[in-house]
Amino acid sequence: MDRRALLTGISLSLALPRFARAGDFNTFLAALQARAAAQGIPQSIITQTTGNLVPNADVLKLDHHQPEFTETWAVYSSHVLNQARIQEGMQKAGASQNLLTAITSRFGVGAGPLLGIWGIETNYGTTQGDFDVIDALTTLAWDRNSDYFSGQVISAMRIIVNGDAPAQKLIGSYAGAMGQPQFMPSVYLSTAISFSGNNQPDIWTSDADSLASMANYLAKAGWHAGQPSSEAVLVPASLDISATGRENMRTIGYWVGQGVQRLPGALNLPSDMPAALLLPDGAGGQAFLIYANFRVIRHYNPSDYYALAVGALGRMVLSA
């Protein structure tokens, strides 16, 4: 049975208590379809992808009921940097060594951040989501009255028009992020590449295209080749933490002068290299020096925890 056909009647009304207004969705959908046509999307694609849509109750439930609690870095990192993910990353690093070397040579982005993003975003491509992306994005665009999500719907249609992927391949998260890198459709259009050179980037089933597309994204966002994004350090109990935080850039030499200790095996970096000291759980918790590439990773996902985890996972899987 068509899953979308189940999202009618009382089940839909229970799922949509804030906005189940008669006629709203059809009116919205007609306007979105007209906008797509005005931007050159063929009517056949518009009808194929949106002709029978109704609001997706699963998308709305997930979007409206995101957890509101705040995890500490210690708790978050214990979940994300689990042993299974680290071990799988080590295996992927070994199996993909030649590919990663070629990608680094082309884009200047090392294996560490690529493996870190790959592992955290989709557990190395194994958990990409199972939502029809156009279905999910259309639902979000309607619910939020969002020009952004409407634009993403049209970008997804354009992927089909360009011949990059058929409609049935556009599968991803409830928020519309697709494939192994979890790219939004507009990011796919601007950034995804085919490393094999066939001009049809496959970020769903091709590890090469997925990793190269991630590297291209980071390179375009300003990645500094040969530099880390962050590193764990030790800090003295007497440190004045008022000067810490992502926005308080000093230099490595400044922090070393304040008693911050870099760990054995740390990269040999110039003492005048800009760095900030981040204490995600405050005094007494873990401490990290963060660098310009930390901001680049935050461009991928604007979370300090995420950027720290990407750096940490990349270091762990390459440490074997």
Give a label for each model feature.
Residues L239, A243-A320:
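C-terminal soluble interaction/assembly domains
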